[in-house]
Amino acid sequence: MDRKKKAVYFKKVEEEPFARHMGIKLVDVDEGYAVCEMRYTDEMDNLYRNAHGGAIFSLIDEAFEISSNSHDRIAVALNMNVTYMKPPKKGSLLKAESKEIMRTRRT
């Protein structure tokens, strides 16, 4: 992916209201690939004072959104599955990497 096209995706994430609200930043993008990061803050706590699964899932979904749409065609998720292993530490930088493994026109 050329530099100009990458810049378009960085700008899209910077301007996306939800990504801004969550503090999600695009770190790298290529065709079928994206890396996003987000700092875990107190505002992302669940009622047990651990990271809310929805906050973590939002980071994952953002990386997926960018990688799957990096071919200039709108793509959507039909299904996503997450296994949460253990909660992150407060203030830690969370990272989501999305790699496309197959692209077809069929569902």
Each predicted region: which residue ranges?
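Terminal targeting signals and extreme-terminal segments of soluble enzymes
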Residues: 1-107
